[in-house]
Amino acid sequence: MSPKTETKASVGFKAGVKDYRLTYYTPEYQTKDTDILAAFRVTPQPGVPAEEAGAAVAAESSTGTWTTVWTDGLTSLDRYKGRCYDIEPVPGEETQFIAYVAYPLDLFEEGSVTNLFTSIVGNVFGFKALRALRLEDLRIPPAYSKTFQGPPHGIQVERDKLNKYGRPLLGCTIKPKLGLSAKNYGRAVYECLRGGLDFTKDDENVNSQPFMRWRDRFVFCAEAIYKAQAETGEIKGHYLNATAGTCEEMMKRAVFARELGVPIVMHDYLTGGFTANTSLAHYCRDNGLLLHIHRAMHAVIDRQRNHGMHFRVLAKALRMSGGDHIHAGTVVGKLEGERDVTLGFVDLLRDDFIEKDRSRGIYFTQDWVSMPGVLPVASGGIHVWHMPALTEIFGDDSVLQFGGGTLGHPWGNAPGAVANRVALEACVQARNEGRDLAREGNEVIREACKWSPELAAACEIWKEIKFEFDVIDRL
């Protein structure tokens, strides 16, 4: 570089390191309707001021780096930088606070959850100045959400396809999840569907293993679906897991499912990745397939209160990336989920407009405009005694899935399905008659047992099964 060039490069530029808060902490900033807003739970290292830590998050997740660079002068940082515009303490946690960060829309590629997360959570979580960092919520503006297709079909279109209204949908995960041959797997699918379930399901890790290759499973499950439909007169489905080691293989499995004429496929969206999931969702929209989403690996990301990402953020990301169902916890079963928090992100999945409500963990008002909704799936350690609570908590627009609670019935798979269908119909009827399921639920189930021996047997076998542990994810 010539001396003349060096002089020009140094005009208005002072090398060195300066506090992030001098540039990225802007409490006077008024957020715009087009900004993406983030709420971070920040735990700074001892001696790091709250303003500096919040500004560091804004900087490292947008335009900043650890030192001043002269190329800052070649762009407009005021236009593109993230801004920490507010900081508030976390009640009961002296070392934690919530940092609110606003990101200008131009920082993100349209229609790409992958790019959104790479920017906002891709690098900053390893920052040494922070002991821990958790993304609690995102506000996605309509200007950005409209660049996504969203769910392939949505709740109303799914009900129309299935011709099922006025009640939750009923499902079952085939167990044991691994080890069955394709033919025996298909037999279990048939028995459960024949007994009265709407859906059966591959578990998240059922892909294409030596004991059951994917093509064989798809064929036997399709046979089971058609046989059960012919015998019951109801539309049935099985979530055929298309998740694979490559996107090309995943799409090949989805194409084969469509050729078989089945109504729904499945994807593990976190282990499979957002790019793969969005591609599959677009294919499902174009080809009339419903898309069931499993959240395998979510607890690695969202379980800890002070680090990672809350599931409400993953739920919003899924609604944009695309899925017609997603597992959302049960509140009453074996998996983590506090009631108010769970219902907060259930509303974020289903509703068009969700008001800010900190009592349910919703940090921002979210307007999805016309994006279709996603059915929440309650699954994990639930059985017939849970049916009143599940019906009352989740309402009609949900899928209730009983794996062990169906296949663990003492009389077999079909009677297990009958027991769950009878329990569901009894709870829906009682609710429609004005009865309080939260208070009278057990009595509703006992009354139904009088005319359903299958339900009576299920109630007897699971009458003392409870999962009573403290919930970690509290507000």
Swiss-Prot record:
GO biological process: photorespiration; reductive pentose-phosphate cycle
Gene3D superfamilies reported in the protein's UniProt record: Ribulose bisphosphate carboxylase, large subunit, C-terminal domain, RuBisCO large subunit, N-terminal domain
Annotated propeptide span(s): 1-2
Catalysed reactions, as listed in the record: 2 (2R)-3-phosphoglycerate + 2 H(+) = D-ribulose 1,5-bisphosphate + CO2 + H2O; D-ribulose 1,5-bisphosphate + O2 = 2-phosphoglycolate + (2R)-3-phosphoglycerate + 2 H(+)
Single GO cellular component term: chloroplast
Other observations noted: The basic functional RuBisCO is composed of a large chain homodimer in a 'head-to-tail' conformation. In form I RuBisCO this homodimer is arranged in a barrel-like tetramer with the small subunits forming a tetrameric 'cap' on each end of the 'barrel'.
UniProt similarity note: Belongs to the RuBisCO large chain family. Type I subfamily.
Subunit architecture: Heterohexadecamer of 8 large chains and 8 small chains; disulfide-linked. The disulfide link is formed within the large subunit homodimers.
Annotated protein name in UniProt: Ribulose bisphosphate carboxylase large chain
Gene source species: Pinus longaeva
